[in-house]
Regions:
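Extracytoplasmic, non-cytosolic globular domains
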Residues: 212-262
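Carbohydrate-recognition beta-sandwich/jelly-roll modules
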Residues: 1-84
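Structural recognition of the beta-strand scaffold that forms the well-ordered cores
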Residues: 51, 55-61, 89-96, 101, ...
Length: 354
């Protein structure tokens, strides 16, 4: 369950589920309701918990800042989360799309954006918005600051390879291949112009993802939201990302979250469990009751398939201060009424959505 508003978005203990939830065996570590009631902390749980043992919870920048989040804004939310929400299970901050675009703006994407890339075409943070990334440091310093607070850092990524890398025919790290060798110019995102697809029948395509994930893992990344994966369903790209994450050798597990969802068929559940920790089951959800209402049917379909380590995701929680520089709408407090917000939280908890 991901908050998407600014630091004013506060909800304590929304992860507590009822006795039936625990009786179903998720999670398999006893009654956390009683644990929470007695201990009022999440810090003493067993150290051997499996990856994504409960639905991941945290904050995502999209609904408030769109493509334009800054380092200072991320750290302000991180400090607030550490002080007020961490002990209730909220522990991950996710930098959403276009952190590598120095011309990023509210309300849309830029054609032919001058993306910041390394010599192998891998994305690097805009050092103006993220000053600690200057000098090729990437998100390493920011991840260290977030980890120091006892939290995790995640980020968004589009599937495929940057068009700029293909136009310049940059080399694929560790191989004799180039970006033009591995690009798939026919399978591109319909709504974001940054990337081409990857030709997964070419061995250099896996090498591209391996090199990209090796870089991201070296920064200390904990969570990766990969977009344009499920509508249509790109099984070869999903599997390639999963393999790349498994190969990254920096001692940290990385949760893979797939987005967006559309109307994902439950027949994909075994494949999704094999390759990801989370997968969206809808398109973007905003602060409109009609968006929330549609999630009842989606979560009803997916609830029987929820299991430790692998979660169907009903999308972020659009509460609090949103729209500051977002894709949709203007600066506002969530338009959902208090009753609608309570209903959303109840539905997400019953459906065990991240």
């Amino acid at each position: 369950m991901g908050l998407s508003g600014g630091v004013a978005s506060l909800f304590t203990y929304p992860y507590v589920r009822d006795a039936d939830w625990f009786a179903a065996g998720v999670p398999p570590y006893g009654n956390l309701y009683e644990y929470q009631r007695k201990q009022d902390t999440m810090t003493d749980l067993p150290q051997s918990l499996p990856q994504a043992w409960r639905p991941p919870m945290g904050w995502n920048s999209w609904d408030s800042y769109g493509t334009t989040l800054t380092e200072d804004e991320l750290l302000a939310n991180a400090r607030f989360m550490a002080e007020h929400l961490k002990n209730a299970g909220w522990d991950t901050l996710v930098i959403d799309i276009d952190w590598y675009d120095p011309t990023a703006r509210a309300h849309g994407y830029n054609d032919n954006a001058p993306l910041i890339l390394d010599e192998y075409g891998r994305q690097l943070p805009d050092p103006v918005r993220f000053p600690s990334a200057a000098g090729g440091k990437g998100f390493g310093p920011l991840a260290a600051a977030v980890h120091e607070l006892g939290l995790k850092l995640g980020m968004h990524m589009m599937r495929g390879i940057p068009r700029i890398a293909v136009d310049k025919n940059l080399p694929v790290y560790g191989t004799n291949y180039t970006a033009k060798d591995v690009a798939d110019l026919d399978h591109v995102c319909k709504w974001n112009p940054d990337n081409y697809g990857l030709n997964q029948s070419h061995p250099g395509a896996q090498a591209w993802y391996d090199a990209q994930l090796d870089l991201f893992a070296s920064w200390g990344l904990d969570f990766l939201k990969v977009d344009d994966m499920q509508t249509p369903f790109h099984s070869d790209e999903i599997a390639a990302y999963h393999r790349a994450i498994a190969k990254a050798e920096y001692g940290r597990s990385i949760d893979l979250s797939l987005s967006p969802g559309g109307w994902v068929a439950t027949s994909y559940v075994d494949f999704l469990r094999e390759n990801a920790q989370m997968w969206r089951i809808s398109d973007d959800l905003w602060d409109r009751w009609e968006d929330i209402y549609q999630q009842f049917a989606r979560l009803a379909r997916w609830a029987p398939f929820q299991t430790t380590g692998h979660w169907a995701d009903a999308d972020m929680v659009p509460f609090g201060h949103i729209g500051l520089r977002a894709e949709r709408g203007d600066d506002r407090q969530s338009r959902l009424t208090l009753d609608e917000q309570k209903t959303l939280l109840a539905l997400w908890c019953m459906g065990r959505s991240p």
